């Protein structure tokens, strides 16, 4: 009879009896051996990870795995590896050449030798730590590691890669286990042999471990899919062959690959509980299930019907439930359930079906050997609380020969429950053979791994990874098949998902998501009564279009995101966790979530995490293999890393702390060296080469958010009197066409203005919420108990060691406002050409100009980012050109005003050196010249009026000469305060007189005929004097200035309203006139009196000048 085969992926059209109703193949001894070995290795590793609670103990000794992979070391040490190769050949119907086999077996046996030698040396060192034993174990470890690195490629030859995949995966596991021990113990080996050069550290081996975890995961997964695709594309392939490859390579390869990430000892220093949620099947394509939430069997109803051959199993109704939702079951019906009788097989909570024995009669019809008939007996073996039970279904027909098939094959008869699988799916169809009146049972059995916990129980001692497919509710059809290395299917979160968990004890946990996304996606997470919103950053860039498949993803496309808040879970209570995607789902914008991780928080965990955080944080400060600081590592970040180092336990990790301290000090030195700011630590404000500040600025120390000093700006009186802090970076420190960046950290601010000034001002306003809650404390205080970015009500003081908001150990996110953290800021400014003579520099100005403003900030730094190019270069060139043109115009305008004012000022003096005023220079002349000086614009910065502007030098040159003229004027005037610039100081005045400002000039003003001011003066009787008065009289009556001496000699200058036509020199102020009078006092004292007879009298100045020889 012609043979008809399945074409994978296409619904079969011609179903031949031989292709479906065949006698199930009895597994070969090779298959039993290799699948058994694979299952045992995976079970051993899962158990080891879950119990790895002591960092000083080896995770898995080589002696534990050796009996599995080399079961007969004396008789045939290569036996199991040969069987792995034979199994690969059988699955893919291909052959490995003898030469390739021999080479591969030689390398695999070589792995055993180097691991054996290493483990002997390791045990000797453990028993007797010394320089000699440490040197030997280091050498043998490195030899073993080098052996794997050199020879693993021999197991991945392109022609034979799929056939050797099982061998490769087992060997990769041995290598990762070896590197895991290197990370654990290398630093201890080095400490025991301090004088040995060129030793690799634990950190070096950790970097290599991460590289090989990723490499092995990606290679094994892609090679598995390569073999699967080869079967799909084969012309003569049955579903059974295809499914056998999936099932057995899942048990040997994918299950083991799913454990590889957890060799990362620094992420999982105290072990982890894992679960494999994938489902493996026996038998037929159309009886397997598509991806869906993980389910549990609660009972099976078996229905019976009678035919000529006797009673038989005619239908099955399964009852299933989602994890944690056992009171809501789903029913699946297969076959005919409306028949003779039924039998219920019930599973109690915690009871699982682990084994089935199925009896079916068989006949030989039309040349078909052992054509199986209907099911008449099933023995279900269940497991609960380490006890096995049997539950039977039996129709008691013995009319035909019977054959019993066991499911699943126990692959070596292991009695350990940790290596078993649980029945998850039992679909059935009844088929009638067309060429004979004969009915046959066709069924499939789905099995899930026993590592899956039915309660989502969270461990109190190690990390717990709970696959999200164990949720009880998910919307929008969002369960998809996993990529192969996750141990099961994934949730594509399109809307929301809910899962139940239960903690084994009252404890705090750090909760993380293991996810992949191709865009930044906001997700809200509710854990019991606690809630948090997170922004998951993209982990890969490929879009989810029609060409995208989950197999396109690599291991590094998945990342962890840890919630910033540790959450306390109650003991033995169900906790509902709800995840909701906050954006509107868009086709192609993918968010895949694999697992939730719960890490218990206790003192040991905290100490270990402090050490791991410090290690990671210190390692990423520097550019690889150099002593250069990474550009995006800020000064604040370094301080926070220093805090992490300080918080390493002295009792437990003194060596590590001593090792990291010089590194962090060196990083701080590099940060200070590249910082162009003077006095960035605010050691001495208003000193030379420091910051300039006014009285509203305070230096603060002891703020728990800052390791060093910070600065505080208080509110301004008004916008004309801001609180300010500024500094100029000298031109000599700058490079042409270069970008510089100002960075810092703001604790909180309101109306804080920042201006970066070179070619005009870059005005920035920072309103930063003061949301970093700080508990009060009293000194002295442990530095590790100073700060917590959130309020911790369980502790009497803040714990700086728990501070994680602003310390990113990966240092891969720039702390600026654009990326979402308002407390950290970074802004850039570009230079064009540089000119040390012009010394344009960069001005950095902070100010508060509002009565409600305030700010506290620190860790300021200005660093060089690098040379400009492209659009940035063109932009700064345009900006500099525009600024230069505008500046030239302003300078030209100022030069004209300068020339006019200078000419006027020159006329004030009697000589070019400015040592003497002209005799006829009046104070009003000086004021008029000063007005011309003040017409010059851009004297001070537009940003802050105390900072020199473009024309400051011109202005100050003229203003200094004006002040010189005033000083000379005051020096020659015998009358003190004769211009009333200081009001009525030095004058004896009646109550009805005052000084008023007339057109910005101070003038004495009388309020009545009896108003009077007077001043007594000392003079030299042998000299003549000139009395010069500038005044104005309004209305009727006269104003007078009288001078008299002790000999009653009286001289008077009289002013009237008719003086405007007087021929004396006129003043700029309307109607003011200047009159003079020569006097020759006969005594050494005189008195000047000013008054009027009626109406109003104004006096601008009174001068008494001694005559020159």
UniProtKB/Swiss-Prot annotation:
One of its GO terms (biological process) is sporulation resulting in formation of a cellular spore. InterPro entries: Cry1Ac-like_dom-VII, Cry_V, Galactose-bd-like_sf, Pest_crys_dom-III, Pest_crys_dom_I, Pest_crys_N_sf, Pest_cryst_cen_dom_sf, Pest_cryst_dom_II. The keyword Signal does not apply. One of its GO terms (molecular function) is signaling receptor binding. SUPFAM superfamilies: delta-Endotoxin (insectocide), middle domain, delta-Endotoxin (insectocide), N-terminal domain, Galactose-binding domain-like. It comes from the Bacteria. Keywords: Sporulation, Toxin, Virulence. The keyword S-adenosyl-L-methionine does not apply. Belongs to the delta endotoxin family. Promotes colloidosmotic lysis by binding to the midgut epithelial cells of insects. Toxic segment of the protein is located in the N-terminus. This is Pesticidal crystal protein Cry28Aa. It comes from Bacillus thuringiensis subsp. finitimus. The gene is cry28Aa.
């Amino acid at each position: 009879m012609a043979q008809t085969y399945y074409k994978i992926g296409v619904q079969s059209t011609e179903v031949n009896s031989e292709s479906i109703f065949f006698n199930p193949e009895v597994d070969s001894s090779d298959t039993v051996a290799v699948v058994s070995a694979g299952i045992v290795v995976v079970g051993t590793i899962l158990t080891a990870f879950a119990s790895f609670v002591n960092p000083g103990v080896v995770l898995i000794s080589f002696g534990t795995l050796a009996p599995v992979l080399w079961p007969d070391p004396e008789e045939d040490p290569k036996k199991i590896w040969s069987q792995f190769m034979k199994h690969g050949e059988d699955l893919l119907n291909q052959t490995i050449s003898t030469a390739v086999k021999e080479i591969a077996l030689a390398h695999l046996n070589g792995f055993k030798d180097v691991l054996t030698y290493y483990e002997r040396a390791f045990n000797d060192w453990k028993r007797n730590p010394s320089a000699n034993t440490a040197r030997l174990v280091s050498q043998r470890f490195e030899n073993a590691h080098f052996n794997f690195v050199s020879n693993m490629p021999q197991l991945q030859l392109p022609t034979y890669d799929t056939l050797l995949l099982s061998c490769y995966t087992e060997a990769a596991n041995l290598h990762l286990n070896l590197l895991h021990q290197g990370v654990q113990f290398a630093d201890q080996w080095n400490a025991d042999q301090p004088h040995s050069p060129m030793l690799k550290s634990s950190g070096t081996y950790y970097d290599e471990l991460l590289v090989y975890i990723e490499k092995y995961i990606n290679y094994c997964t892609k090679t598995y899919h390569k073999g699967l695709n080869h079967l799909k594309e084969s012309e003569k392939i049955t579903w059974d062959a295809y499914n056998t490859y999936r099932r057995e390579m899942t048990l040997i390869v994918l299950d083991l690959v799913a454990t590889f990430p957890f060799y990362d000892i620094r992420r999982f220093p105290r072990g982890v509980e894992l679960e494999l949620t994938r489902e493996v099947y026996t038998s037929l394509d159309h009886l397997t299930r598509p991806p869906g939430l993980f389910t549990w069997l609660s009972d099976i109803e078996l229905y019976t019907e009678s035919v000529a051959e006797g009673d038989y199993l005619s239908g099955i109704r399964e009852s299933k439930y989602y994890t944690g939702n056992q009171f809501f079951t789903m029913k699946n019906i297969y076959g005919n359930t409306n028949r003779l009788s039924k039998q219920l097989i019930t599973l109690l909570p915690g009871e699982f079906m682990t084994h089935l024995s199925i009896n079916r009669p068989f006949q030989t019809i039309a040349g078909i050997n052992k054509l199986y008939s209907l099911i008449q007996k099933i023995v279900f073996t269940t497991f609960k609380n380490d006890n096995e039970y049997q539950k039977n279904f039996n129709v008691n027909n013995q009319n035909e020969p019977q054959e019993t098939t066991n499911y699943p094959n126990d692959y070596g008869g292991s009695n350990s429950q940790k290596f078993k699988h649980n029945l998850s799916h039992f679909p059935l169809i009844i088929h009638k053979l067309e060429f004979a009146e004969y009915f046959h049972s066709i069924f499939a059995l789905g099995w899930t791994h026993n590592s899956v916990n039915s309660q989502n129980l969270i461990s109190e001692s190690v990390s717990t990874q709970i696959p999200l497919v164990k949720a009880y509710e998910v919307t929008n059809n969002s369960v998809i098949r996993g990529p192969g290395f996750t141990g099961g299917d994934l949730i594509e979160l399109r809307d929301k998902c809910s899962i139940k968990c239960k903690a084994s004890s009252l404890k705090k946990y750090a909760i993380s998501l293991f996810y992949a996304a191709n865009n930044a996606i906001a997700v809200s997470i509710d854990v019991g009564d606690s809630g948090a919103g997170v922004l998951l950053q993209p982990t890969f860039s490929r879009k989810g279009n029609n060409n995208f498949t989950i197999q396109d993803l690599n291991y590094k496309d998945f990342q962890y995101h840890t919630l910033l808040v540790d959450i306390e879970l109650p003991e033995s209570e169900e906790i509902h966790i709800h995840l909701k995607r906050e954006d509107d789902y868009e086709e192609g914008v993918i968010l895949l979530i694999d697992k939730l991780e719960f890490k218990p928080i206790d003192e040991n965990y905290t100490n270990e995490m402090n050490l791991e955080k410090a290690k990671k944080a210190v390692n990423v400060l520097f550019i690889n293999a150099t002593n250069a600081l990474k550009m995006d590592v800020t000064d604040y970040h370094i301080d926070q890393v220093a805090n992490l180092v300080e918080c390493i336990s002295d009792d437990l990790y003194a060596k590590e702390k001593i090792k990291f301290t010089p590194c962090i000090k060196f990083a701080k030195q590099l940060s200070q060296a590249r910082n162009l700011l003077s006095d960035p630590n605010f050691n001495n404000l208003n000193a030379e080469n420091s910051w300039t500040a006014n009285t509203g600025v305070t230096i603060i120390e002891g703020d728990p958010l800052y390791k060093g000093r910070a600065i505080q700006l208080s509110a301004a009186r008004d916008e004309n009197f801001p609180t300010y802090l500024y500094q100029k970076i000298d031109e000599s420190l700058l490079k042409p066409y270069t970008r510089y960046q100002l960075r810092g950290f703001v604790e909180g601010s309101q109306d804080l203005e920042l201006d970066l000034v070179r070619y005009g001002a870059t005005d920035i306003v920072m309103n930063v919420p003061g949301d970093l809650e700080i508990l009060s404390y009293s000194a002295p205080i442990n530095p590790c108990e100073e700060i917590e970015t959130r309020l911790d009500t369980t502790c009497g003081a803040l714990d700086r060691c728990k501070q994680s908001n602003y310390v990113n150990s990966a240092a891969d996110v720039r702390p600026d406002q654009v990326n979402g953290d308002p407390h950290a800021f970074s802004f850039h400014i570009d230079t064009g050409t540089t000119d040390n003579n012009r010394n344009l520099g960069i001005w950095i100005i902070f100010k508060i100009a509002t009565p409600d403003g305030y700010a506290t900030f620190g860790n300021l730094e200005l660093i060089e980012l690098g040379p400009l190019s492209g659009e940035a270069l063109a932009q700064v060139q345009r900006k500099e050109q525009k600024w230069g043109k505008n500046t030239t115009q302003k300078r030209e305008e100022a030069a004209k005003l300068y020339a006019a004012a200078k000419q006027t000022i020159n006329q004030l003096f009697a000589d070019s050196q400015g040592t003497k005023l002209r005799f006829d220079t009046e104070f009003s002349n000086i004021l008029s010249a000063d007005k011309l000086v003040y017409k010059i614009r851009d004297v001070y910065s537009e940003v802050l009026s105390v900072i020199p502007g473009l024309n400051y030098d011109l202005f100050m040159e003229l203003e200094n000469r004006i002040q010189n003229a005033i000083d000379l004027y005051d020096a020659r005037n015998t009358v003190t305060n004769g211009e009333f610039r200081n009001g009525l100081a030095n004058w004896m005045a009646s109550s009805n007189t005052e000084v008023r400002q007339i057109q910005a000039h101070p003038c004495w003003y009388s309020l009545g005929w009896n108003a009077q001011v007077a001043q007594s003066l000392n003079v030299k009787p042998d000299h003549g004097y000139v009395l010069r008065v500038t005044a104005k009289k309004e209305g009727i009556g006269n104003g007078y200035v009288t001078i008299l001496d002790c000999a009653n000699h009286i001289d008077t200058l009289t002013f009237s309203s008719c003086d405007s036509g007087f021929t004396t020199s006129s003043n700029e102020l309307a109607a003011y006139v200047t009159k003079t009078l020569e006097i020759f006092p006969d005594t050494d004292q005189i008195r000047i009196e000013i008054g009027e007879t009626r109406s109003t009298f104004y006096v601008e100045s009174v001068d008494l000048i001694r005559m020159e020889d």
